[in-house]
Regions:
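Asparagine/serine/threonine-enriched low-complexity, disordered tracts
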Residues: 106, 133, 155, 180, ...
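Extracellular beta-strand/beta-solenoid scaffold signature
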Residues: 74, 101-108, 123-132, 148-161, ...
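Extracellular beta-strand/loop-rich repeat segments of large surface/secreted proteins
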Residues: 456, 465-567, 575
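Solvent-exposed adhesion/ligand-recognition segments of exported proteins
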Residues: 21-95, 556-620
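Sec-dependent, cleavable N-terminal signal peptides
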Residues: 1-26
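Feature marks extracellular polysaccharide-active and adherence modules
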Residues: 62, 70, 76, 81, ...
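Cysteine-rich, disulfide-stabilized extracellular repeat modules
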Residues: 32, 38, 55, 112, ...
Length: 620
């Protein structure tokens, strides 16, 4: 009679007749609702077993069910891949499952669809790969601790679309984290790691292990779409080194929200080396805190987005830089938040919005690339009560050499300059400070009760445009310097000031127009609000070139529909106008029913006759 031999082969392991050899054996545990740390349960599957599978063995859960573990276990490799299971360690003593396979082959642990409740998973200092590719989702909860990991990877080797949730006061301890550790030859990504419910991720690696990634080894910028979502009170992620959100990849998101916090030595939002692409990576902080401790925040690639709402961002104790110098067309939106940092370096195409009366935006940079940097296409908006008051000590020269940039101050926001030595408001120049430093085709908008003020304000440069739409531009200072210059210095040319809406306001000691400037009023449909006067200057009006050849006064009444004969005050001065100045105002080209008049030698008014009302007859 031949002796029956039972052979199981896995990873080169051989089990003969149910007894262990020196090689690893593979054991499938298929007992529904079973305890895979119970020898008697194993014997129902493998009757000849005399001890539990151990550090030379591969344990594989082979059924869609709930499993428990009633004592600590150490195995070579562990898997519930391709099954939907619940590992209910919490109800069976919160014991430790130690997985010891080295950093070769499959790296010890496989998980696809399932829930792990409580207990400890100890990776013995090795890498831990979860293989959460498309359609697979695992939840770790109820205080489960995943510990002693070298590299922790949610997805690897070109897999995409998986989700891993770390919830319920759980813990992850590793040297480094990879949401997606892809392949240079395969497009991959769209991986989610959610950390919530008071859970904590602690990454403690040094050297090469000090770098954690949303996406590494991706295919030349084509991979991406990974999300690290940290949210909820008490939820934290602490990185001893650097976190890179978007390494050679695109559209990756780091979100910190709802009382959660993220700390790292440094943070990169987008990163690339020569020849590699990265774009559209995002940092979203919504009611959360992001801090760096020892290094800066750096953004790279086109279209980076920073979105902060009720947030705190602190860069290296408030002294570190935020560097966007390699991030063209970045969008930064800061609302009701605290930003504590040092230098703020920008790149062309910046779109920066700072909003909220309680927002603190502490940076050493004062110009956001719109000083004498030659920047093209930057846009800055101060909004919703935010007050920006840079302290410079030599005046604020904005848009000196920039082109097609814009500054918008609106909805109760304030832009002003401060001289710390004199403890006074300082001068603000828009558009250049010399014939060799000229800003061109820039726009300054003051809207919806927004406010710009300084000791002296000047619009200069070439073809720059100041638009006051129900906003206020005013000067505060000594009579000798309290003035607004609309076209300052003989190298200015083609600038324009437009007053729009029912309550546009210029308030200055003196108003000066010159060097090819257009002063334009756009009268709204119903005219100005009661008692509203767009320009008031108690110290008078002055035209730099008295022959008026270069300057233009315009009044656009195309929207104005007076219901009766109407008089609107456009400007009121505290000193008499000269005959040349009167002629300049009266020279505006207007339709027949409108004309400019000078009242008491000091007030410029627009008079309008109501259009004759005819009878309309309809014959059917």
């Amino acid at each position: 009679m031949k002796k029956k031999i039972h052979i199981l082969v896995a990873s080169g392991a051989i089990l003969i007749g149910g007894s262990f050899s020196s090689f690893a054996a593979t054991y499938d545990f298929t007992v529904a609702e079973g305890d895979f740390a119970n020898l008697d349960t194993w014997k129902t599957l493998y009757p000849s077993l005399t001890k539990l599978p151990g550090p030379d063995d591969y344990v594989r859960l082979g059924a869609n069910s709930t499993f428990t573990m009633s004592q600590d276990m150490t195995v070579l490799r562990f898997s519930f891949a391709f099954n939907t299971v619940v590992l209910d360690f919490a109800s069976s003593g919160n014991h430790t499952l130690k997985v010891v396979e080295g950093n070769t082959l499959n790296h010890g642990f496989f998980a696809h669809n399932g829930t792990i409740r409580g207990g400890v998973i100890d990776r013995d200092g090795k890498n831990m790969y979860w293989f959460q590719n498309a359609g697979y989702e695992t939840t770790v909860t109820d205080g489960c601790v995943i510990t002693n990991c070298d590299k922790f990877c949610v997805n690897v080797w070109g897999t995409s679309g998986g989700k891993l949730h770390l919830l319920g006061n759980s813990r992850l301890h590793a040297d480094s984290l990879f949401l997606n550790n892809g392949s240079a030859n395969v497009v991959s990504g769209s991986t989610l790691l959610e950390v919530a419910g008071g859970s904590k991720v602690m990454l403690t690696g040094t050297g090469d292990d000090a770098y954690s990634y949303s996406d590494a080894n991706s295919k030349n910028g084509e991979s991406g779409g990974n999300v690290l979502d940290i949210h909820g009170s008490g939820t934290t992620m602490d990185v001893s080194g650097f976190y890179i959100n978007g390494y050679h990849s695109h559209s990756n998101v780091l979100r910190v929200a709802d009382g959660a916090s993220f700390e790292a030595k440094g943070l990169h939002v987008g990163f690339y080396e020569a020849g590699a692409m990265t774009r559209g990576n995002r940092l979203i902080v919504d009611g959360g805190t992001v801090k760096t401790k020892g290094d800066n925040i750096t953004a790279k690639g086109d279209g980076v987005v920073f979105s902060l709402t009720n947030a705190t961002v602190e860069i290296n104790g408030g002294t570190g830089a935020c560097n966007f110098s390699s991030a063209a067309n970045a969008t930064i939106d800061i609302v009701d938040s605290v930003w504590e940092g040092g230098a703020f370096l920008t790149s062309p195409g910046l779109n920066l919005r700072v909003a909220g009366e309680n927002t603190r935006f502490a940076v050493s940079e004062k110009f956001f690339g719109m000083g004498n940097h030659g920047t093209v296409g930057n846009s800055i908006c101060f909004d919703d009560g935010f007050k920006w008051r840079p302290s410079l000590g030599y005046g604020y020269y904005f848009m000196q050499t920039t082109t097609n940039c814009s500054l918008t101050v609106k909805n109760g926001a304030v832009f002003s300059a401060w001289h710390p030595d004199n403890n006074t408001n300082d001068k603000i120049f828009f558009g250049g400070s010399s014939a060799t430093e000229l800003g061109a085709r820039n726009v300054i908008r003051v809207m919806s009760d927004g406010e710009i003020y300084g000791r002296e304000i000047a619009l200069t440069g070439v073809e720059n445009h100041l638009v006051i739409s129900n906003g206020l531009v005013h000067t505060v200072g000594r009579e000798s310097s309290d003035r607004i210059w609309l076209g300052n210095n003989d190298w200015a040319n083609g600038n324009c000031v437009t007053l729009q809406g029912s309550t546009p306001r210029i308030r200055a000691g003196r108003c000066v127009v010159g060097n090819g400037t257009t002063l334009r009023f756009e009268i709204p449909e119903t005219g100005y609000a009661a008692d509203a006067v767009p320009i008031e200057c108690p110290n008078g009006f002055h035209i730099i070139d008295p022959q008026n050849a270069l300057n233009t006064f315009q009044v656009d009444v195309s929207r104005f529909v007076p219901e009766s004969t109407t008089q609107l005050t456009l400007a009121q001065f505290g000193k008499d106008l000269t005959e040349d100045q009167k002629a300049w105002f009266k020279g505006a080209e207007l339709p027949e029913r409108y004309r400019i008049e000078i009242v008491d030698n000091r007030t410029v008014v627009l008079k309008a006759r109501c259009a004759a009302k005819g009878l309309a007859v309809s014959i059917r």
